[in-house]
């Protein structure tokens, strides 16, 4: 039986983009789509899509080999590739390649597919799938109590705005945004959202303790990085509005906010000069990277 395989890898936000692409591929190609999760066998990342009610099956080693043509001798694979019959897609990060969704001989897809146009046609389904369920009650008592404490603060705010500041592995390679981006975004937001209440999310507690945004804020910085992807995304999408970082993690939190009048602000420059990852109705604010680098500076 014919089928296609999409690789799942990276952190939670990346996995969500890959799954959204896979579901869209299934719809457009009218072909069964399987997920290759073998990257987590050697990566320090975890398969987190199981937090959601996903319904695409996992590919077996044999199915992955067939999709990659690895069941054929290497010389045969190379010959087919030279003849234009390669069945493995080129790596896609930010580029929008609509032809990938059309019927083709491609059977294995790898990349990040970070453009909402890949799944615009099934947006309601994707949002329904990625609406996180209530926190699990067992083995997370302390974290659940902290979550509900923070959630009560957000829900009590009349005009809640989350601000995500991505540092972590971005620091030192020139990918973290200068804080002037958040300040300009807050100036824009303050003119449109009266009496806004800010909730700052960051994985760097020391950084937020010395942070000056020009506006008062509640520090929601997590103290448990292992649980950050689950609990903090729940909290961010509970806000009315959002200021995201150049991070797929806060991108999805903003995308899943249910407020029909939400204002979402994102950096004009994402990574490597790409801009199309932001939804068309979101506001783009000029930004620069804090550490200058020819490779990473936009």
Label the predicted regions:
Residues 18-25:
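Short amphipathic alpha-helix
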Residues 12, 190-277, 282:
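Donor-binding and catalytic core of enzymes assembling or modifying cell-surface/extracellular glycoconjugates
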Residues 31-42:
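A short beta-strand-loop structural module common to alpha/beta enzyme folds
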Residues 1-5:
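Extreme N-terminal starter segment of soluble prokaryotic enzymes
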Residues 272-298:
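Leloir-type glycosyltransferase catalytic cores
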Residues 7-17, 174:
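A short, glycine/small-residue-rich beta-strand->loop->alpha-helix junction that serves as a flexible
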Residues 43-193, 298:
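Secretory-pathway luminal glycosyltransferase catalytic domains
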């Amino acid at each position: 039986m014919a089928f296609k395989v999409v690789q799942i890898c990276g952190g939670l936000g990346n996995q969500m983009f890959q799954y959204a692409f896979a579901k869209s591929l299934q719809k457009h190609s009218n072909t069964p789509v399987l997920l290759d999760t073998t990257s987590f066998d050697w990566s320090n990342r975890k398969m987190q899509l199981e937090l959601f009610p996903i319904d695409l099956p996992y590919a077996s080693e044999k199915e992955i080999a067939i999709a990659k043509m690895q069941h054929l001798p290497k010389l045969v694979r190379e010959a087919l590739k030279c003849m234009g019959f390669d069945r493995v897609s080129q790596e896609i990060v930010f580029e929008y390649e609509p032809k990938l969704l059309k019927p083709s001989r491609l059977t294995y897809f790898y990349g990040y597919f970070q453009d909402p146009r890949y799944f615009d046609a099934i947006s309601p389904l994707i949002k329904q799938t990625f609406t996180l369920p209530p926190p699990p009650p067992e083995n997370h008592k302390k974290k659940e109590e902290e979550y509900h404490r923070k959630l009560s603060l957000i829900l009590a705010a009349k005009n809640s705005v989350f601000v995500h500041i991505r540092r972590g592995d971005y620091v030192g390679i020139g990918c973290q945004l200068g804080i002037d981006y958040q300040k300009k975004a807050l100036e824009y937001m303050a003119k449109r959202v009266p009496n806004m209440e800010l909730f700052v999310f960051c994985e760097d507690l020391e950084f937020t303790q010395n942070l000056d945004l020009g506006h008062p804020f509640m520090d929601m910085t997590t103290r448990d990085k292992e649980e950050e992807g689950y609990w903090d995304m729940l909290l961010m999408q509970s806000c009315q509005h959002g200021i995201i970082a150049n991070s797929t993690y806060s991108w999805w939190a903003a995308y899943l906010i249910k407020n029909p009048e939400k204002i979402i602000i994102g950096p004009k420059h994402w990574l490597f000069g790409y801009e199309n990852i932001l939804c068309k109705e979101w506001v783009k604010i000029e930004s620069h990277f804090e550490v200058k680098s020819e490779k990473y500076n936009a």
